């Protein structure tokens, strides 16, 4: 019986031609952009861990109290009845994401997304510590599960539990979380279950699923064809300068571009794509290919920038990108409208909510001189 037919068209970078999973083991190139991303990533991690401990006006800076139906956001408390305010806040954030994507592309994916931050700057370095570099990891793939590879999983599990507990603190607060950690899980089974499920999902994601979260699951990547245009900032390959390619340094008089087809940009990509094929859904603009290519250009005596930040227009024509265009002004105008409405409703909000409720028991009592109604008054402080 014959085997499966090879694919006649391009398959996903994370798949082999027969449809099996292709494990991605990117080679690390440390350059100027990697250093900037490293500083940014650890700053965001510090913010994620430290934000639940920050209190403003006696409340956590960010708390999503689902059971209490309260949302604390930097000193302001939103209730379930504040539907208008929450809607305006969400629309403002949503439009801001669209506007930034139109200007700087998927910079969020490569620089700020938790998937990239934790994968490339926490879990991947630990993996390299236990397994070695790209070549060693490929050898371990052929050997199957080994002691060297198995040792990383306890470290992954410990980190996953830590991330899950910090995540839980955003919903219950650090004070209650600390109380739970000092007691038996049987006394707070729901909280323990949420932490356990979150830790399991984090472990599954960073130990196995990895880049497929970006290329298969994440809807943001699917929207780039709508949110980007030919003037949006992307990471791209300069074909005019790089083509035609040559193996090794070009000889004097040879008609060859600067690209020496070393595949450094391919083996360093965390999603496994070849950036020279143009803008692709799987590209998260992490700039690893820029650092890799610049290091090769330095070795062969060529100027950097064969792979660089730019727009599709600038990469194809060499012309300078003009940022000014309708969407660059329409989105900020809409953001200004909704943000102004949010500020307006926040400023005119009352310092207290007074609610008249029906009393417990009989709604009224008949007395000799008249009828006495049973009522309850609920006064809720809304001042900061």
Model features per residue range: what roles?
Residues 101-116, 206-221, 249-297:
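Cysteine-centered iron-sulfur cluster-binding motifs in ferredoxin-type domains/subunits
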Residues 370-376:
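Short, solvent-exposed loop/turn segments enriched in Ser/Thr/Gly
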Residues 363-370:
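Short, solvent-exposed beta-strand/turn "edge" segments of beta-rich domains on protein surfaces
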Residues 380-384:
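Short solvent-exposed strand-capping/beta-turn motif centered on an Asx-Ser/Thr pair
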Residues 340-363:
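Hydrophobic alpha-helical transmembrane segments in integral membrane proteins
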